[in-house]
Amino acid sequence: MKGLGTLFLLLTACLASRADDAATLPDIQVQENFIESLIYGKWFNLAVGSTCPWLRRIKDKMSMSTLVLQEGATEAEISMTSTRWRRGVCEEISGAYEKTDIDGKFLYHKSKWNITLETYVVHTNYDEYAIFLTKKFSHYHGPTITLKLYGREPKLRDSLLLEFREVALSMGIPENSIVFMADKGECVPGDQEVKPSPHLRARRAVLPQENEGSGSEPLVTGILKKEDSCQLTYSEGPCLGMMERYHYNGTSMACETFQYGGCLGNGNNFISEKECLQTCRTVAACNLPIVQGPCRAYIKLWAFDAAQGKCIQFTYGGCKGNGNKFYSEKECKEYCGVPGDGDKTN
C-alpha cells in the first residue's frame, strides 16, 4: 500500500533534509487506511522539496516526469517505471519497491550507492494527488529527507501547490529548496529534446515579501498569489501539532489566531499578524474604528482616523485589533489614499 512512496524514490538522486531532522523521523505517519491498489497507475511528479545541496544546484534543470506503479513480480514487490528528461534525452528507469509490514511504507535499494531508501505515502486522495516523504542515510550527506508532490494529471489545483509548500516548510525544508517542475510534456524513451527553451525553467516557491508598504508587488507562492487565499476559511490540517498561526477573517476584517496542526491546511495561514494584514487587508479597513485591544504590549502603530481624515499614531496592545492598523505612516497613507509625503515609521 505504498506504491506512491516508490515513485518518490526513483527520482531521489538527491534525497535531503537537515541531518538532525531526518535522524528524528522514526514515527512518520502514513496515509490513514492506506489502500495499495488505489495507488497503482500513472502519476506526474509536479514538485519536490529538499535540502540536498546537489538538488539546489540543478533545480533549474528539473522538469516534470511520469511514474507508473503496478503489481510487482512477487506479492512482496511493487513494480515502478519512471520516464523523464535527463540531459536532453528521454530516459526510462524501471525497478521494484519492497513492501514492509507497514502499509504505506516501502524500501528501495540503490545498488550503485549501496544504500536503502525508505519511502512513505504521507497523504493522498488516490484520484488526484499524493505527497511522499523519503528518508535516506549516506556517508556523504548523513541522514536526509525529500518531499515530493504527485498528481494524476500534469496540473493540480493551486491550493494543493500551496499545501505542499506548507508541508515542506513544516518539515524543515528551506524555501529555496522547494521546486515546482516545469512542464515540458511527456516523452518517449530515446527521444532527444529539440531545443531547450530558456523560459521553461523550474518554478520556484517565492519568499514572502518583506516590504513594509502595501504598494509593492503581490506576494506569490509557487504560481498562486497568496492574497487569493485570504477569503478561504482557515484550516487546521490533519496533523496534530499546535502551532499558533494567523488567518484573515473577512467578516471582522481582522487577522485572528488559530492552532495549525503542522501540515496541509490552506493558504490562509500566516506566521505573523503583520504578514497576514499586509497580504489580505483591503481599503475598507480605513473605515474601521481604531482599536487598541485588551492586551498591554504598548506597540506604536499607525491608523486612519476617518473623523480627522488623516493617519495618526496610536498604541496597540498586541491582540484583538482590526485591519485599521499599519506599520508605518507611509503604509497607512498608501492604503487610505491620504496625500502627503510623510514617511515616519513606528
Swiss-Prot record:
Site (described: Inhibitory (P1) (trypsin)): 296-297
Superkingdom in the source lineage: Eukaryota
Enzyme class label: oxidoreductase
Disulfide bonding pattern of the chain: 90-187, 230-280, 239-263, 255-276, 286-336, 295-319, 311-332
GO cellular component, one term: cytosol
Record key words, sorted: Cell membrane, Chromophore, Cleavage on pair of basic residues, Cytoplasm, Disulfide bond, Endoplasmic reticulum, Extracellular matrix, Glycoprotein, Membrane, Mitochondrion, Mitochondrion inner membrane, Nucleus, Oxidoreductase, Protease inhibitor, Proteoglycan, Repeat, Secreted, Serine protease inhibitor, Signal
Sugar-modified residues: 114, 214, 249
Signal peptide (from-to): 1-19
Tissue expr: Expressed by the liver and secreted in plasma.
Site (Inhibitory (P1) (chymotrypsin, elastase)): 240-241
PANTHER family: PROTEIN AMBP
Protein name: Protein AMBP
Organism: Meriones unguiculatus (Mongolian jird)
